[in-house]
């Protein structure tokens, strides 16, 4: 089995991080993986040397393609035995889009969590689906980091949040 992974792993975004971790996890599991970037912005994000090595490999002989992007960007390709969609959504459904139509052309769909699976079912996606969480290299959490020294925050309550404002 040889897998072609197409995704935005060079974009410096959360999507890029997910694609990066997926590619490295496939490689660590012993899958013969080749990756190709899908550029969705003009940011040059950090890419590990291992990813660049996998990117330099030939895509000849790939029998599975994983498309890690938004469903309207996906396309079925009959040259592969399997066309896998790996996608994210933060909505309860996507009925009023072409996403289900595009997804239903593919062989199977992978989603990171139950809520995306539920949104897919609610939107009439009928291909076989699987929950494939975004992998995480836990070694980075065992590393010791120097605390940030921000003088004007000394002896003050500091509230951290990770969020998105749209």
Locations of regions flagged by a protein language model:
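Acidic anion/phosphate-binding donor-loop and adjacent secondary structure
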Residues: 95-98, 136-151
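Hydrophobic anchor at the start of a short beta-strand
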Residues: 33, 83, 127-129
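Conserved donor-binding loops in enzymes that form glycosidic bonds
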Residues: 8-9, 88-90, 134, 161-166
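N-terminal subdomain of nucleotide-sugar transferases
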Residues: 1-40
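Extended catalytic core of nucleotide-activated donor transferases of GT-like folds
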Residues: 4-6, 37-121
């Amino acid at each position: 089995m040889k897998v072609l992974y197409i995704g935005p792993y060079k974009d410096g975004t959360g999507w890029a991080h997910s694609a990066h971790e997926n590619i490295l996890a496939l490689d660590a599991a012993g899958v013969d993986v080749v990756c190709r970037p899908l550029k969705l912005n003009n940011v040059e994000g950090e890419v590990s040397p291992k990813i660049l090595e996998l990117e330099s490999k030939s895509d000849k002989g790939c029998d599975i393609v994983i498309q890690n992007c938004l469903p309207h960007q996906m396309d079925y390709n009959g040259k592969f035995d399997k066309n896998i969609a790996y996608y994210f959504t933060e909505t309860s459904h996507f009925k009023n889009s072409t996403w289900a139509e595009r997804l239903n052309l593919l062989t199977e769909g992978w989603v990171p969590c139950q809520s995306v699976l539920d949104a897919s079912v609610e939107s009439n996606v009928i291909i076989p689906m699987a929950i494939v969480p975004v992998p995480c290299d836990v070694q980075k959490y065992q590393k010791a980091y120097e605390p940030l020294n921000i003088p004007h925050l000394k002896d003050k309550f500091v509230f951290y949040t990770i969020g998105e404002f749209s």
